[in-house]
Amino acid sequence: MRLSSTTFVVLAAVLLASGTAVSKADETGVTNVNAVHSPNVLAGVDKRFLRSHHTEDGEAKLSNYDNEERNGLFGANTLSNMGKDTILRFQMFTKWKANGYLPKKIKDDIPRSLYKAYKIHYRMN
């Protein structure tokens, strides 16, 4: 009994001693950190244009990828990938059903093969 309690006390002391040594090592050298400024940032011209391409007249136009992304559930790229990937097809069918898309309403918006598969999925789930 004395050996186990002595071992416990020694281990606790070692852990406490090593914890304080590590924390003191982390404190050194951190006090003199300066902010890094980009040389490309000009005063007043720090506006970022994400996902857009600016033309000469100053208007932003979305790329084809961005337009496709905004088409969401019925984008051409999404429908094409659904024809190849059965897992994606099942996930999208589940989203369509959760959003209330009836097979009859989306018949003209999707390829015939996907329509048939969605009709079966809609009835089964």
From Swiss-Prot:
The keyword Secreted applies. A motif (RxLR-dEER) lies at residues 48-70. Disruption phenotype: Leads to the gain of virulence via impairing effector-triggered immunity (ETI) allowed by host resistance (R) protein Rps1d. It comes from the Eukaryota. Residues 1-25 form the signal peptide. Avh6 is present in P.sojae strains that are avirulent on Rps1d hosts, whereas the gene is deleted from the genome of virulent strains. This is RxLR effector protein Avh6. It comes from Phytophthora sojae (strain P6497) (Soybean stem and root rot agent). The gene is Avh6.
